[in-house]
């Protein structure tokens, strides 16, 4: 799978201008958020595995500031792009942003995190490529390849249409394995535990959250 992502990264890098144009053409409506963490995640529980809550969409367009994020959706309510405002360059008098592109193929979705650039410029590189494999519209596996050669694989297991465990293999470059269990006390609440040998460590929600 690493080789597959490397090949896709090379191919999509050459198509960045075309892919950015397709986002503009496909966009049917947009949403906003202004939290440090995004309000959308392709990989299930990606934010929560870090111990944090997922951001929330706003009802109205906010004033542009650091951490503001703009999401682009097509006519089928699929996300096709995301733009994050990183910081304002006082010398150039314009914002530096990071763009994300979403590409849909049969039984899978790609997320491309592009290199940061001024908002009036087009990025030229892909800093991270993520691929999620779908089965019956559910994410069953995800793969990440970073510019620093970090590579990860996550496997999601379901029960009653809910994710109940996640197994992660991370190469940095040595292999690190992690196992997480997810409990659902009720329909609106979930708890994530990291399994460490015979013990369980609660990682979400944090006790002070």
Predicted regions and their residues:
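Buried hydrophobic residues that stabilize the cores of well-folded domains
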Residues: 1-209
């Amino acid at each position: 799978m690493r080789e597959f992502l490397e090949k896709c990264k090379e191919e999509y890098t050459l198509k960045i201008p075309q892919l950015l144009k397709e986002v503009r053409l496909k966009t049917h409506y947009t949403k906003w958020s202004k939290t440090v963490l995004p309000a959308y995640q392709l990989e299930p529980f990606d934010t929560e595995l870090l111990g944090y809550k997922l951001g929330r969409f706003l009802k109205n367009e906010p004033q542009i500031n650091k951490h503001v994020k703009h999401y682009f959706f097509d006519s089928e309510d699929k996300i096709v792009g995301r733009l994050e405002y990183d910081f304002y360059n006082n010398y150039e008098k314009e914002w530096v942003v990071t763009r994300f592109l979403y590409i849909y193929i049969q039984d899978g979705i790609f997320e491309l995190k592009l290199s940061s650039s001024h908002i009036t410029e087009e990025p030229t590189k892909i800093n991270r490529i993520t691929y999620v494999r779908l089965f019956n519209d559910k994410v069953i596996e995800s793969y990440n390849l970073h510019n620093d050669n970090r590579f990860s694989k996550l496997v999601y297991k379901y029960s009653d249409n809910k994710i109940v465990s996640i197994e992660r293999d991370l190469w940095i470059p040595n292999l690190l394995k992690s196992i997480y269990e997810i409990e659902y006390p009720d329909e609106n609440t979930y708890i994530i535990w990291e399994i460490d040998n015979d013990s369980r460590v609660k990682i979400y929600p944090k006790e002070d959250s």
